């Protein structure tokens, strides 16, 4: 039979457009992604419900599987059905509808009367092919023909995968990172399943199966038990050994399967995180001598024995001399004259009189001038909360030691301002330790000084082991730099400098303005 003659090209608005039907390409629709759960009759009824005159449902195999051609009476009906069917979600599938192209006209129905005949012929031909060639391997039935795996899937084979856990997901991630092809295929699969792309920020962790699974106690170790029956005699030894081997193998298989099932249900244990061992460094005598006492940890300063007890005065060898004058009677006369005057003076003060009458009187120690000076200097401080100047001087290293250390080689104090920069801090240092040292330069009774006092200790990143301390004024900052620079805190000497301030360069701006 010859194919149908193509229609005459006519203008849309010319005469005869209403009587002549439009070309078949304009009224035949190709419907893709039909659900596999529907039968051919149900698919045909579905498309006829939307106004199709003739429907041809293709087979579920091949290039055009799960597709159908639907021919409508006119172009308007085809357009209306396309708008209603396109992107329609049906049983979890999204339909894709488009006008049939010229290359697909071979598969499209020729007339309404031939649809059922061709459908029956196709079904009979396919059934004959399946009956005649059941063992022939085709590319469509193969697992992965591109990789050489052309054998079909076993229909009886069913996989029972365990639920996802943290260890399984970690192993999958490791496989993704090590096999680039696997990574690309996973991205393709996510794209086909309309999952969100993994290129953005980290998404929230979904609830895992292991979070809701009850914990099982581990199996106790099985202790070896003696055999219940004694060994048989030598004659039946071969038979008994064979029977016992069969029985033991069956029992071992059962026990092994039971243990595997119990272990599969057990929640995986988290691997123990071993703490890195800290290697103790050998301390030098120089560092051990300069280690400060535990005063930085306590609120009250440590009192030295010299602060509590009187220091013994060094008594030198005194020479005793006697000057005996020759005019003894005259001296006695003078003493007798002075005695009544002394008695009158002593009568006014009774305490002194008692002292003069009884022995030598009270002996008081000499006042220690150094202690009074230190008390007057530290009177402005709060020794119970902050470090004293004496402890600062004791904990500092000498200038000779500063020259030997690499931290102080290129030391410069910087431009004076109210903020100081502290570096070379130990990792155990906390903000309260810095407050214990630099709080002595702040008057906490003043609200302004209390607000200006600020400590920022860097504990992470490349600024680790450094701190910025804000003091009320430049005078306090200069005093803190002078007294605290080189103080050994937790075995490391502090390096104290003035912080760099971002001041505007007035000279350069004025030169530009000029």
UniProtKB/Swiss-Prot annotation:
Its main location: nucleus. GO terms for cellular component: nucleoplasm; nucleus; U12-type spliceosomal complex. Gene3D superfamilies: 3.30.70.330, 6.10.250.610. It is found in: Nucleus. Residues 1-26, 106-133, 213-282, 337-363 are annotated as: Disordered. InterPro entries: Nucleotide-bd_a/b_plait_sf, RBD_domain_sf, RBM40_RRM1, RBM41/RNPC3, RRM_dom. It holds the Pfam family RRM_1. Residues 27-102, 418-501 form the RRM domain. Component of the U11/U12 snRNPs that are part of the U12-type spliceosome. Found in a complex with m(7)G-capped U12 snRNA. Interacts with PDCD7. Participates in pre-mRNA U12-dependent splicing, performed by the minor spliceosome which removes U12-type introns. U12-type introns comprises less than 1% of all non-coding sequences. Binds to the 3'-stem-loop of m(7)G-capped U12 snRNA. PANTHER family: RNA-BINDING REGION-CONTAINING PROTEIN 3. This is RNA-binding region-containing protein 3. It comes from Mus musculus. The gene is Rnpc3.
